[in-house]
Regions:
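Accessory terminal helices/loops
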Residues: 15-16, 223-225, 236-299
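Boundary at the C-terminal end of the N-terminal hydrophobic targeting segment
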Residues: 20-22
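Conserved beta-strand hairpin/beta-sheet module of binuclear metal-dependent hydrolase folds
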Residues: 29-77, 182-194
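Divalent metal-coordination and catalytic microenvironments
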Residues: 30, 53, 63, 78, ...
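Metallo-beta-lactamase
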Residues: 58-60, 66-68, 160, 167-251
């Protein structure tokens, strides 16, 4: 009975803690992940992840989710952890589910940072995506108050940020998921925010990807020796998940190419891929979209 009571108290404490942080998970003394894996709906950013790093001088935010509404939700949870000024926002890439919440943090005076290629991508496609949000399963009310905010600072290959006692490395890992994808690496606690280089338990979005570079990037990330990896989508991960992502990409590309060359249509190719690949979230929709956009563009 004593063991049961102790266990019950522990569970209650953990539940209270999770409610207090509302999605923020403490990874180290000053690093938190914001994991969205429980709700993969469009209005909740397709379960995109984000995070924060807290230094003596302020806060760095990693990705801002899909809308002003989602950004405000994220900000409210950040304020339960710290009242320090938010100095920087880093977009690991500028797809809508990772960068359309920029407006919330820019209003606070945060400097938004990305790789130069993904600033160009957002400038080219952001307004059009807002105009045709229904194509992404979003309703007008989901994007109420959302404005496209382009990164104010860019870099080419690598950038270091001293947040006051916390060293942060921004490393270009492209071309891969996009032409300007980057990772956020904290060498001291060995924590990596991979952005959409890594999808764990989710089928990845491949439409803008360059698979040869993506596979090389996954090789490189395994050499960093991260103790904890926050993927772009999915639960807290490890090097094992990076390796499984490589296996997935190779298998997807090989099978899709072979079947497309035989004249198979999108439904047949998707069905075979879903039969072969590990079961993951966003299955039929994502796999079908990837097949049509990468392997059947002329059909």
């Amino acid at each position: 009975m004593q063991k049961i009571f102790t266990l019950s108290v522990t569970v209650i404490v953990l539940l209270i803690a999770s409610l207090a942080f509302a999605g923020l998970t403490k990874l180290s003394e000053n690093v938190y992940s914001y994991v969205g894996e429980k709700d993969a709906s469009p209005s909740h950013s397709f379960a995109a992840n984000a995070g924060i790093v807290i230094g003596r001088d302020g806060v760095l935010v990693v990705d801002t989710l899909i809308s002003a509404k989602e950004g405000e939700r994220f900000l409210a949870d950040i304020r339960k952890i710290t009242k320090k000024p938010i100095k920087y926002v880093v977009n690991t890439h500028t797809h809508l589910d990772h960068a359309f919440g920029n407006c919330v943090f820019a209003e606070l005076g945060a400097t938004v940072i990305s790789h130069s290629a993904d600033k160009t991508l957002l400038a080219k496609s952001g307004a059009e995506i807002l105009t045709h949000a229904e194509a992404y399963g979003l309703k007008p009310e989901d994007l109420a108050g959302t404005a496209i905010v382009l990164p104010a600072m860019t870099f080419s290959e690598r950038m270091s940020i001293d947040l006051g006692g916390v060293e942060i490395e921004l490393i270009r890992t492209a071309p891969s998921h996009t032409d300007g994808s980057l990772v956020v690496w904290l060498p001291q606690p060995k924590i990596l925010f991979s952005g959409d280089i890594l999808f764990t338990d989710f089928h990845p979005f491949l439409a803008d990807g360059e698979l040869t570079g993506w596979l090389k990037t996954l090789d490189y990330l395994q050499t960093l020796g991260a103790d904890k990896i926050v993927p772009g989508h999915g639960p807290l991960s490890s090097n094992k998940d990076l390796k499984e992502m490589q296996t997935y990409l190779i298998a997807f590309d090989r099978t899709a190419r072979e079947l497309a060359a035989k004249g198979q249509d999108a439904d047949a190719i998707s069905a075979e891929l879903l039969r072969q690949l590990p079961k993951r979230s966003l299955a039929e929709w994502m796999v079908g979209y990837n097949v049509k956009s990468r392997y059947l563009k002329e059909k």
